[in-house]
Amino acid sequence: MELKRISYKHKNNKPIYYLVNYIRILIPSVYYQKKRAQKFHNKEHIGGIQKRVNYYNKLSNTVLLKDPIQLSDIKKIPGSKVYFFDLYQYSRYFNQKLKGLFLFGDIVKVPEQPTFVKSRPIADNNANSVLLKWNKLRHFMFIKKEHSTFLEKKNMLVSRGKVHKTQPHRIKFMEQYYNHPMCNIGRVNTNELSPLWKVPRLSIDQQLAYKFILCLEGNDVASNLKWVMSSQSIAVMPRPKFETWFMEGTLVADVHYIEIKDDYSDLEQRLTYFIENQDKALQIITNANTYVQQYKDQKTEALISFLTLKKYFEKTDQSQLL
């Protein structure tokens, strides 16, 4: 029998997600707007809230948008329905005549105008990319319970994921480390790349039997990074180039994850070091687990999402509609 693609005990519940969101859109937004003050009023003072809002939304000057889309028309934007659902979860609390720009999908370039996105390059000049917590059904998944400690796990690196012809960085890693004695890696998709790299899938629980889990960026960020950092294994990756709501740009090398060079040449040396220095490895796990905790408070996450939207409307000269 084919192995399930993922351990469902760690996965977000897709049927419930869709049910809740379809119910939301059946209720007129004016109902939610009446509840806004009760839900969000006078909570901006909570520690760390404004810092995160300003990280996601770096707009400092007032900007006039060219050809923006009204909130009431967002459902007409082509793209995945989950992006609309994740946006509507908080945009429903605003006047639906407010306008903005929205790019759904894996975004790796900074737009010319302030635009809501799921991902952006890690750079000083990325203010036009305003981050929202999108596609969270897939990306924001955390380990709920783990039975093995780091010390009980295999002294190896594991990786299971898709490798496409358009991802030379992933191809390069496969070329260098497929069949390496310290690695259990392979691709799970079918294409024209080496058939030797095609391997059976591993569930999340099976991957958690290894001390080290590869978190290579794909089209934008590494989608497994969140659950790996919530586990008793350690994420191994080059310094990230893209970021999402998870604020990958704030992660510190060898504090939250094990950093390897962009050409992967030091992988064996880095793994060996942390196998021999388990106290340092355990500290990384503690740091990573602590970092993840801030995303588990749903009330705080909701408030930050609301305030990120509110700041955008203020900075695009729409305060009169708030």
Show where each model-derived region lies:
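Secretory-pathway glycan-assembly enzymes, especially type II membrane glycosyltransferases
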Residues: 1-196, 202
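Catalytic binding pocket for nucleotide-activated donors in carbohydrate/polymer assembly enzymes
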Residues: 205-322
